[in-house]
Amino acid sequence: MIQSFIITGFLGVGKTTMLTNTVKKYFKNKKIAIVVNEFGDIGVDSKILTNVHSEVLEISEGCICCKLAQEFESGVSEIVNKYNPDIIFVETSGASEPFPIFLSLQNLGISIEGIICVVDAKNFDTYKENSTAKYQLGGSNIIILNKVDLVTPAELEEVKKEVIQIKEEYNIKNNLTGETVFNNYMIHYAEQGLVNKEVFEGVYQIDEVIGLAKDYKHLDHTGKDSITQKVAYLKENVRFNDIDQLLSALPKSIYRTKGIVKVTDVPNPIFINYSFGDASYEELPEYKEKSLLIFIGESIADDVKLLSQKFPFLILPQFSINK
C-alpha cells in the first residue's frame, strides 16, 4: 500500500525546507511524489521542490477544501497510476488546515502515516492566536518544533507548553464516539529543517476512519485573521542590494514574502524566502520565468501599494491576487 504524510503548519514555519531536507536525506532510494498546495495561483514552493524531485503536483488557490477536493483526488490518482510511488508527501498551504486533505487521502484508500505540523519555535508568539494555526495543530498527530537552535531552553519550554495547550483544545474528535482522535501525538525538535528519521518510520500510522470531525467547520478565510496575498513583478536592472533594502522595509503586517528574482550582480536567479523578519537566499540556475515576489499577511493591500511607490522596480498587476 502507498504511504503518505501530510505536512502542515503556518506561513513561513519551514515546511518546504523540512520536506526538501527529508527527501534528500532519508528517501534517496524510494519513489517519492510530492503534492504542493500553494497559496494563490503562482507556485513558488513547487518550483523549489521540483529541483529535488520531478514528480511534483501543484494544487493552487490556497486551500484544499470542498471546491478543490475533486481536483486534489484526481491529481493524486493520476500520480498513483502513472508513477506508482512508494510515498506521497502533501505539503499544505500555510493558510489552510490539514483535515480536508486527510479525508481525501482516506477516500483514495491511501495509508496516512502521519499528519505533521511544523511550528516555528522562534516566531510562534507572533501567529499563535491565528485560528488557522490552531486548527493545524489540532488536526495533527506529529508536531515538529522547528528552529529550536534559535531560541533559549526556557523559550523552547514555553513554546512547547503553549503548543500542547492549543493542541488539546483544538484536537479533532470522532463524530461517532466523541472521543479525541490524536491522544497519542508526539513532539519532535528540528534544527534548520532537519528532523530524526523516526518521524517518518510509520510508528504513528492513523488506522481509524474518522469521517467528519465532531464540530469541525471549514474555515472560510474571511475573518479578522484571514490571510491576503499580493503579487509584484520586478523590472530589469535590479541589484541584490535593492532587494535587501526592500525586505528590510517590510511592515509587520507582511510576515511572509517569497519569490524568485533575477538581479544584475548575481549570475543565477535567486529564490527569496522571508518570514517574520528573517530572510534566506538560494540560487536557482534552471529558473527561466519572470522575476516576482509574493507578499503575504493581513490587510496588506495598502502596504504593498506604498512599497511599490517607495521601490519603483516593483510592478503591481492590475488585478492582484486577494484570497
For each predicted feature, which ranges?
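Hydrophobic side chains in well-ordered alpha-helices
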Residues: G75, I101, V159, D242-L246, ...
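C-terminal accessory "lid"/substrate-recognition subdomains
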Residues: I142, V151-K290, S299-I300, L314-K323
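C-terminal partner/receptor-binding element of secreted or periplasmic proteins
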Residues: D303-I315
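Helical mechanochemical/support elements of P-loop NTPase systems and associated helical scaffolds
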Residues: Q3, L68, E97, Q136, ...
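Flexible loop/N-cap segments at domain edges
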Residues: F295
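Nucleotide-state-sensitive switch-loop elements of NTP-binding domains
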Residues: I2-T8, V13, T17-Y127
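Phosphate/Mg2+-binding loops and adjacent switch elements
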Residues: E78, K82-A190, V195
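Short, solvent-exposed amphipathic alpha-helical segments in soluble enzyme
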Residues: L49-N51, L105-N107, K134, S248-A249, ...
